[in-house]
């Protein structure tokens, strides 16, 4: 296997960390998505065989990890610990160089992976253990190993405390994180970005749109209903002396307003179901959908990825497009994901891949696409960066163009889209501070001012 120069640098750095006599043996591999972190890790495993290696990953990429190890180091024996018929014998782990295991198995009552001492533990997409109160975090902390690696492009997934949790897994305490962040960054974190390597540039653009009058009318209705409901809930919460008792209900109201901005039919269907009424079809226009379709039509010689929040909007887009369309959403099996990916990569240049953000942010290598559309902004900038990284990665031959479609609001009815983008900026600032990567502040363009979660809740002036 021939590595790129930045990958050789990464492998050498990791081997130095594993042989270090000072501090924890391991650290953070935080390369930006798409720079080949897996290839670097497999090379380290191959060059420093020191007992069995445990690789813990999201369930959706267990098979991909197994395949990548076979591809990059066929001499390594790989054992997949997953499925109904998985082994109950911990000694099986010691008979293989690498064991790949999903995070879900860490939460068993007596996890089998706790029964042996591993040479190395790798947590891929390590933000999965960011909650220190979760069973996943507590179980991961109990895994015994000589070397410990955290692998993620987003060590600050929601807040800086996420990073504190990941440091704890490595063996770095909270006080050290608070007092010695710069030292930790220099010694224990390696991060390279695509701008510094031979990957074509990625262009980001927020496309701000005015809603059509009929959309504005529906949004005003949804906003006003949410505002009234939230005000009433806040009064009840205050009377009970419990300010958080209606948090989920408040978020549901926020979601309804958001649905109008994604695709109005979602809101109409949701209200009909709630009121047990007959569903009516949305007959109005959608500026966001029209802009999406027009933009796709302007680039018939490039493959396109469309990232959506809701399956309902995916259904509409799939119905309207006349080009070849492929799809991954939260209901897709592992086999379906793999077949859709393979078919898209073989498909004509005008093909479109519809991907639900929560289902397609990990484990997909789609360098054949060079146009990306995000129909609704995500709460977390890291989620969007992961999605974009599916095509803007090592092996990409074209420049990648990313467009995020955002509806504008007004003083009376503020835009949910704009509020989420503002929140992204706040989180991007935290990313930049922890990773020492100023580029992250502008990688996902947003408004100039940030917005806290409490301010998001107050968007309805309730």
What do the PLM-derived regions correspond to, one by one?
Residues 379-388, 392-462:
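A conserved SF2-helicase RecA2
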Residues 48, 113-118, 141-146, 366-368, ...:
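Short, conserved loop/helix-junction motifs that constitute active-site signature segments
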Residues 146-159:
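Conserved helicase ATPase motor motifs in RecA-like P-loop NTPase domains
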Residues 108-110, 159-160, 314-316, 352-370, ...:
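SF2 helicase motor core recognition
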């Amino acid at each position: 296997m021939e590595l790129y120069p930045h990958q050789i640098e990464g492998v050498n750095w990791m081997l130095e960390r594993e042989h270090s006599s000072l501090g924890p043996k391991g650290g953070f591999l935080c390369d930006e998505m798409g720079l080949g972190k897996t290839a670097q890790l497999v090379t380290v495993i191959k060059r420093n065989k020191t007992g069995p290696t445990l690789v813990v990953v999201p369930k959706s990429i267990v098979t991909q990890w197994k395949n990548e190890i076979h591809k990059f180091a066929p001499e390594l024996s790989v054992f997949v610990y997953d499925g109904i018929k998985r082994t109950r014998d911990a000694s099986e782990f010691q008979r293989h160089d690498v064991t790949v295991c999903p995070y879900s198995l860490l939460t068993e009552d007596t996890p089998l992976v706790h029964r042996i001492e591993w040479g190395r533990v790798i947590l891929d997409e390590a933000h999965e253990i960011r909650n220190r109160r979760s069973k996943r975090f507590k179980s991961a902390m109990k895994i015994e190993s000589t070397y410990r690696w955290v692998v993620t492009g987003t060590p600050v997934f929601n807040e800086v405390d996420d990073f504190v949790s990941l440091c704890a897994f490595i063996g770095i305490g909270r006080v050290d994180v608070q007092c010695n962040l710069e030292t930790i960054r220099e010694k224990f974190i390696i991060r390279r970005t695509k701008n510094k390597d031979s990957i074509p540039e990625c262009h980001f653009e927020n496309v701000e749109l005015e809603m059509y009058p009929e959309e504005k009318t529906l949004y005003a209705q949804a906003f006003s209903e949410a505002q009234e409901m939230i005000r009433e809930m806040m009064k009840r919460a205050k009377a009970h002396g419990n300010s958080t008792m209606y948090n989920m209900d408040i978020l549901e109201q926020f979601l309804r307003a958001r649905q109008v901005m994604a695709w109005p039919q979602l809101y109409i269907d949701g209200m009909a179901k709630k009121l047990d009424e007959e569903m009516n079809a949305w007959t109005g226009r959608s500026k966001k959908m029209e802009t999406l379709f027009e933009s796709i039509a302007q680039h018939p010689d490039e493959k396109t990825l469309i990232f959506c929040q809701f399956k309902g909007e995916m259904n509409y887009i799939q119905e309207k497009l006349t080009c070849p369309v492929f799809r991954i959403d939260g209901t897709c099996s592992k086999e379906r994901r793999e077949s859709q990916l393979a078919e898209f990569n073989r498909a004509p240049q005008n093909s479109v891949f519809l991907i639900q953000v929560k289902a397609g942010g990990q484990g997909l290598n789609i360098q054949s696409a060079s146009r990306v559309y995000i129909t609704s902004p995500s709460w977390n900038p890291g989620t969007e960066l992961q999605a974009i990284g599916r095509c803007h990665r090592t092996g990409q031959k074209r420049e990648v163009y990313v467009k995020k479609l955002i509806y504008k609001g007004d003083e009376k009815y503020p835009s949910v889209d704009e509020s989420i983008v503002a929140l992204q900026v706040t989180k991007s600032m935290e990313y930049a501070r922890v990773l020492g990567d100023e580029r992250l502040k502008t990688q996902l363009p947003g408004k100039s001012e940030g917005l806290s979660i409490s301010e998001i809740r107050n968007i309805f002036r309730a």
